[in-house]
């Protein structure tokens, strides 16, 4: 195949290597994990405090049920 356009002296030639830059590797996707309540610790605290810790345990379990965390 012949060159359709002859090279010109005042314009740079096209680089015949890689016409496009190499794409960067994709970013790692975070893993979404639920936040878990430590029930053993709350049970122990409830037993030690004779049940005074139960409202805190219930509130923490309700709050943590809808929470998630991202691990990269």
UniProtKB/Swiss-Prot annotation:
It comes from the Viruses. This is Gene 35 protein. It comes from Mycobacterium phage L5 (Mycobacteriophage L5). The lineage of its organism: Viruses, Duplodnaviria, Heunggongvirae, Uroviricota, Caudoviricetes.
